[in-house]
Amino acid sequence: MIIVVIFFTISVSFLLGRLTSPIATKSIRENELKILEKGKVSQTPENSINCRPGINTKVDNYVIGYGSLMNKDSRGLTIPNSEYAPPVLVNGFERIWASRGEKSRATFLLAIPNKGYTMNAIYYKASANDILATDLREASYCRVKIPRKDILPLGVKSLPKGNFWMYVKDFKDAEFPNKDFPILQTYADVFMTGCLQTQAAYRLSEFGQLCFDTTYNWDLANWLYDRPNPQYARYSADTEKYRSKIDQIIKRIDYNDDLIKKRQAL
């Protein structure tokens, strides 16, 4: 019964998030957290406690964002006080277009464990409630602790002390784009805008290009150009000023420039 209530709350939140004001959205978020606390359960993709490890509140906690969470506006919808988000490189993970959203009927970004791969990202400080809210946002992903040795700071001298969390899936759970679940241009815009925001804030000349280069399966054959009618729920008009730069980075190259071809080039 508790799981049904949580699922209903998440569904309502997702729908109302498009229609309500920031104040109403905050109220929805608070209600979600109350239900989680009351039920003493975690909303996880695998219904397993291992997918949502406990949070040690005696140390600082940080979330690593590598997709829409890189975008300060998108991130702020879930964690309002997360403007400070320094860039990092994360070793041992591959960023790939391979996570389907059933409600949105689209394919989003996913990080999978893969030795020998590195991707760029950001991190931001998060309270226990912030992490629970992000658990709800990333309900189909597992939250895992990333060893400090696998995180390289960029633009700042060193990493702060604490635990670093990231939302991932195993490769066996990857679901690739197709005609029914395309990549949304507006989601790619939100992701790449976050990369360019970080590039400007920390004066990193190629950070945006690195986002593209360390992301795999840019499947242009299954791509929905939805800028005239944005389909992504967390799309922000702020991305429009970055469009020319985004289009320069996401080159309209041959459809065969997919995951396999990019891997062969490594």
Residue ranges of predicted features:
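Ser/Thr/Pro/Gly-rich low-complexity linker/stalk segments immediately outside membranes or between
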Residues: 20-37
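A glycine-rich, hydrophobic/aromatic-adjacent loop/helix-cap motif
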Residues: 32-266
